[in-house]
Every structure is written in C-alpha cells, then in structure tokens.
Amino acid sequence: MATNIANDLNIKLQYGVYVGTTGPTFETQAEYRYFKAIGGDAVGMSTVPETIVARHMGVPVFGMSVITNCGLSDQKGDHEDVQLQGKLAGERMSKLFVELIKQLYQ
C-alpha cells in the first residue's frame, strides 16, 4: 500500500537491509565498511529495538527511514546537516503518512 501511495505522490522509495546500532553516535568509516560487507544498506539506532518491542506485543509494524547522511562519503557528517536533511524530507514523509492513514481507515 505504501509503495502505491509513494508512486502516486512521486516519492522515490528505496528498499534494503537496515543495520541497527545503539547510538547516538556517528559510526566510524570502519564500521560503515563492515556494515556494507555484511549486506547492510542503511544504518540507524532506533528502529530495531522499537520494532522488537512492538512485534513482541503483537503490534503490526511499518518501518520507514530517511537517510540523512552517507557514512562512506568523503564528506564528514555533522549534526546540523543531519537535522537539515531530515527536515527536507519531512514534507514528503508527512504526505505519505497522511495518505497511508487515510487508506488504512477507509
């Protein structure tokens, strides 16, 4: 359902393997290389434990992440840029979630 809504809204989605870390830190280049070597596509810190708890309680889960920094790029990540990238994605994500909720409750 979310894929169809994203297509209708011209929102590009990517699919991949999410690597969960404890955070809150920027991972090292060595960690990013390791995560890539074991098949990881994206790294984050909160989705995994929240999903485990929700599934343990029998709650269905829909996960979506915004990639806010590229760990293996030449650019050094900083907190301000991560916040900016999240803010820029917020409008598209809001539209997607509003439509998803509308369709779930029709």
What do these predicted ranges mean?
Residues 1-66, 70, 76, 80-106:
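Glycine-rich phosphate- or other oxyanion-binding loops that anchor nucleotides, phosphorylated ligands
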